[in-house]
Amino acid sequence: MTPLSLKRRRLLQAGAALALVNLLPGAAAEAFAQGCPAGWPQWEAFARRHVQADGRIVDFSVPEQQSTSESQSYGMFFALAANDRARFAAIWQWSRDNLGAGSDKLPAWQWGRREGGSFGVIDPNSASDADLWFAYALLEASRLWQMPQYLKAGMMLLNQVKAQEVRAMGELGPMLLPGPYGFDAGKDRWRLNPSYLPLPLLRRFAGVDPAGPWAAMAQGALKLVTQSSPQGFAPDWVIYDAGKGFQPDTERSVLGSYDAIRVYLWAGVTDDGDPLAGPLRAALAPMTKAIAAYGGPPEKFNTVTGAPEGRGPVGFSAAVLPWLKATGAADSLAAQEKLVQDKWQTWSRATPKAGADGDGEFNYYNSMLTLFGWGWLQGQYRFDATGQVTPAWACRS
């Protein structure tokens, strides 16, 4: 090849890359311009340990060796982000066959070893956050992979959520119950979970179902977080009374911990162009100061007093990476990213055996938080303001 033809090829390649950047949503274009990640070793490591050949995702950290609708739905999202079609299909098929997902009922939330030693559904109640992630993964798989059968399944599941897990809650408007059963706390009183409502998912659902409750629910989600976090720290659970507003859940817990850490995660991965991103982050600004003061996210907050307790595990540090990036906390971002990276390298070099004894710091839940938080920071996926996801493989295509 002559120097002239080599130069011409490079110019053509650069022009093609620039054209692709211009076709991508803003955040995705920025990620592409900075260089797409070549692979996703954290997903591959998780899949080797936790995703069985039949699509069952196992949490080895509990005696039940359970699989949950959360694990299955999160796994489908990560498989989509990794362009892992075979695992996506297997995870969905296992979920349909064993949890009931995609049938005429919502999926059971817990499957595993039952009393007596047999395996099967332990709790048939559903978990609405997982139901949303199932629907979202299916809708986006249909769009990105051009597979209309996933669109049909996603819309069917979304309709079931509307029918069984959404309630009109006075001035709060339509709101998502954590599940169909067990969350009515009295007349016009409900127990809610602020971490169940990622804004990008609600935006995407509003796009495919504009007559549905999703746009109003996004406004309600902002109220849920801001009005239930008086000290700027989100609770795991909160009571909403249609006559009195939000009240601490003194019966269950006033703490913000393993559920609530996802509130900061979702606020961080929300596109800056979403009009609710700014108010949401402003309401939770004390978390940024707490991370700087304690060298990382505390494990727990008393959300009434604001008092912290303990140091969060590595998954918490990974979960707040998008939050720290979005809020411009450069020093804390660098420190927490280094912590996650160092712990990951140490853990992966040890090549621990699969199972509860070998999970170590990167057990099921810490791994899930790491895939979401560190994966986002790596550029493995981005949401735009309409809730559509752009995975890294799309900008490499």
Residue spans for each PLM region:
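N-terminal secretory signal peptides and thylakoid transit peptides that target proteins
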Residues: 1-19
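Active-site-adjacent structural elements in enzyme catalytic domains
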Residues: 90-97, 139, 152-162
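Aromatic-rich carbohydrate-recognition surfaces in CAZymes
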Residues: 68, 72, 121-143
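Extended ligand-binding clefts on enzyme/binding-domain cores
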Residues: 34-41, 65-69, 104, 108, ...
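Low-complexity, Ser/Thr/Pro/Gly-enriched N-terminal "stalk/linker" regions
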Residues: 22, 32-70, 80-115, 119-121, ...
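Short glycine/serine- and small hydrophobic-enriched flexible loop segments
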Residues: 76-81, 133-143, 200-204, 265-269, ...
